[in-house]
């Protein structure tokens, strides 16, 4: 039952506060508005010369309004001026804080972009290194297969015309010279390969 009683109470309190808020902007109850000049009621004109009117200083609208207000309404005018000043001050604070926040975000984005560029540029040497390692291993494997094929052809006595090329034989001789003896009759291919320094 208490829950049902609090909802109308809260609603009434909200309505009352809204009405009080709106009523604060109204003039006091007994205050009269300044008299509006009508056609029959002319304001006295102090006769200023033509040059005085041309060079006369213009008053701001707020000064004119404040001079025409009765004494009991000047408080509300000053209050509205203070509220406007506070609004401008709050807007200025918000603008300052917001601009600092945007500057920080811009710096953060810039740093992230620099870090991304640095990381992406560091990936390239690693990739190039892994490509070089693969190429090196693959070329060693191809050399081993060429040596194995050559040794098989030498041991079996079958040599193609391509293998009899003197330039190629000189290259292959440089590869085989340091680790093998001159007698190949009783050596198998597997024994020859076991003596080769093959690093994979």
Swiss-Prot record:
Pfam families: Hormone_2. It is found in: Secreted. One of its GO terms (molecular function) is peptide hormone receptor binding. GO terms for cellular component: extracellular region; neuron projection. The modification Threonine amide is found at residue 156. The keyword Transport does not apply. Its main location: secreted. Gene3D superfamilies: 6.10.250.590. Residues 26-87, 119-126, 160-200 form a propeptide. Keywords: Amidation, Cleavage on pair of basic residues, Hormone, Secreted, Signal. GO terms for biological process: adenylate cyclase-activating G protein-coupled receptor signaling pathway; epinephrine secretion; photoperiodism; regulation of protein localization. Residues 1-25 form the signal peptide. The keyword Cytoplasm does not apply. InterPro entries: Glucagon_GIP_secretin_VIP (IPR000532), VIP/GHRH-like (IPR046963). Belongs to the glucagon family. PHM-27 is a bioactive form from proteolysis of the same precursor protein, that causes vasodilation. This is VIP peptides. It comes from Meleagris gallopavo (Wild turkey). The lineage of its organism: Eukaryota, Metazoa, Chordata, Craniata, Vertebrata. The gene is VIP.
């Amino acid at each position: 039952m208490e829950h049902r009683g609090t909802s109308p109470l809260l609603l009434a309190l909200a309505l009352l506060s809204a009405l009080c808020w709106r009523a604060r902007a109204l003039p006091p109850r007994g205050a009269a508005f300044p008299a509006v000049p009508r056609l029959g009621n002319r304001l006295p004109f102090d006769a200023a010369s033509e040059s005085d009117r041309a060079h006369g200083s213009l008053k701001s609208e707020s000064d004119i309004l404040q001079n025409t207000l009765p004494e009991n309404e000047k408080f509300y005018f000053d209050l509205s001026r203070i509220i406007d000043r506070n609004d401008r001050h709050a807007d200025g604070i918000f603008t300052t804080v917001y601009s600092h926040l945007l500057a920080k975000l811009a710096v953060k984005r810039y740093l992230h972009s620099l870090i991304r560029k640095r990381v992406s540029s560091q990936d390239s040497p690693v990739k190039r290194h892994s490509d070089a390692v693969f190429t090196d291993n693959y070329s060693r494997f191809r050399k081993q297969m060429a040596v194995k094929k050559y040794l098989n052809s030498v041991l079996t006595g079958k040599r193609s015309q391509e293998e009899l090329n003197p330039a190629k034989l000189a290259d292959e001789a440089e590869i085989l010279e340091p680790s093998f003896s001159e007698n190949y009759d009783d050596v198998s291919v597997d024994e020859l390969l076991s003596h080769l320094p093959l690093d994979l």
